[in-house]
Amino acid sequence: ISLGLVGSEMCIRDRDEKERAEHLMLVDLSRNDLSRVCRPGTVEVTQFMELEAFSHILHLVSHVEGRMRDDVDALDVLRAAFPAGTLSGAPKPRALQLLDEWEPTERGPYGGVVGYFDLAGNMDMAINIRSATLHRGQAHVQAGAGIVADSDPDAETAETVTKATAPLRSVLTAGELGQA
């Protein structure tokens, strides 16, 4: 299953055209990624643009599923699906180049995957977002928003702040508990 997530509560409330177009692009990216490792005709969207509530944010969620070809394994699926288009943009190779050029710091684990492979050839992966990394006693939290030609900078900034809220609160709470 590949999930396409985009937009915060502020943007989704009206399900504005920009958010729908951005989400559709991400669903198409997921379909394309899975079509490289799935049996022909099996890639389908099983859930489309449904609102789901997370701890501090609402997201539009779509599920894209397909049946794996016999000649591929879990590692092939991982290579096809990641880095996820939800964090890179499109076209993916050029978007990744631009991110390397434009972002002031390396992403580190942010935007990567966390998960496992088992001995039966299965895997379960999640995109590492809404998280904090602790390095040399300092917590690092990263967040972002999808930027497209018709993005509203103020709305994208607000979305980024909203997305960073949960991990920042977790870091602050952990710090308070450590001093208690």
Predicted region positions:
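Positively charged, low-complexity/disordered segments
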Residues: 1-7
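Extended alpha-helical targeting/anchoring segments
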Residues: 8-9, 13-180
